[in-house]
Amino acid sequence: MKSVFDFIVMPEGNRYSNEVNINGDKLIVNSSIENFKLINRKATVLTVPTAFTTPIQEGDEVIIHHNVFRRYYNHQGKEVDSSKTFGDNKYLCQYDQIYLYKRMVKWLPVGEHCFIIPIENNDEWSQEPEQKNKGIVKIGNKTLTSLGINEGDLVGFKSNREFEFIIDKQRLYCMQSNDILVKYEFKGNEKEYNPSWAKSS
């Protein structure tokens, strides 16, 4: 069975990432269905839509929007599944809800999506652990490459674009090509900032 316009996917593991591993011990970090940050966003593609073609293939591992697997409370206070639920741990997912797909061992972006890792804040007078609106391109795209912005480059981005994902135990910010404002030259003291909890996810 295939959907006409949607991918059919299943979560890799549970729908929520409620546990982290700390030194071999499991720690429960969430007990609420309302916390979208801990919804699992990693899925496996079971079928692709029949109405159009994309580079994504059946069996691919993908990173998707949190609303696909989300549970929520309806107007009666009852816990219900997402409207994307297809049954038997299967879910419908639109193409624009997919941000990355994995080909072999490399994550590839869908459309204009790109992923930025923040850098450490070197200001000794600041208590913020990372520099605001600045980071390193970890996963670029064709548009950025055509503009001379490549993976590994230091860039500045628009405010409030910190859409957080954990990809291969790194906390990255997902954004669009037009969220990237400037390419900086490295000064030599920049370091990627990845909080310790992300490495345990």
Feature map (PLM): residue ranges:
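Acidic-enriched and Gly/Ser
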Residues: M1-S201
